[in-house]
Design a protein with these regions (language model features):
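P-loop NTPase catalytic phosphate-binding loop
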Residues: 1-91, 101-165, 169-172
């Protein structure tokens, strides 16, 4: 059962290996799909090849576009999200309102972002609110970039022993 929090759309999840971070991500996505939300993009990046394959199989056909790639290709997902944001911001500027379907991107234990990747990630995070996108990132040892906390509006810790998440929402 998915634990309900007051979640925003830039979510940083931490916990030790085996705590349930990947499970949390799947439950999070399922909570939207089970409520009948129209999801146009599901993107998933992970350094575990088995999890990438499992994600693709689990969600195939449940969104207009399902993309699951390994860590080396995380920049491809950032480029897709930036392209989608550009289109959505153009629509928002023309219509004045965002009515585009939800897009969800999960970066599960996908390593450290630096240089150009970091800049792209920051831009994605900064525009996610206005573009109806949810960005979910997990890590266990080192946050995905320096000062990561200031770019996320919800932080979740998954306890290793109980596998229960606890949440802190940051008001902006």
């Amino acid at each position: 059962m998915f634990v309900k929090f007051k979640l925003k759309n830039r979510i940083l999840v931490d916990g030790k290996e085996g705590s349930g971070k990947t499970w949390f991500c799947r439950e999070f996505i399922d909570s939207f799909l089970n409520k009948g939300w129209n999801v146009s993009l599901l993107a998933y990046v992970d350094y575990h090849e088995g999890d990438v394959v499992e994600f693709g199989e689990r969600y195939e056909g449940k969104a207009d576009l399902v993309v699951a790639v390994s860590d080396e290709k995380k920049e491809n997902i950032l480029d897709i999200l930036l392209s989608e944001q550009k289109q959505r911001l153009d629509i928002l500027n023309k219509r004045g309102v965002m009515r585009e379907p939800l897009q969800i991107a999960v970066f599960d234990e996908c390593g450290y972002f630096e240089g150009e990747q970091r800049e792209k990630l920051i831009k994605v995070l900064q525009n996610a609110d206005r573009c109806n996108q949810i960005i979910l990132m997990t890590y266990q040892h080192k946050p995905p970039m320096t000062e990561a906390g200031k770019y996320f509006n919800t932080k979740i810790h998954v306890d290793y022993l109980t596998h229960k998440p606890s949440s802190v929402t940051i008001d902006e």
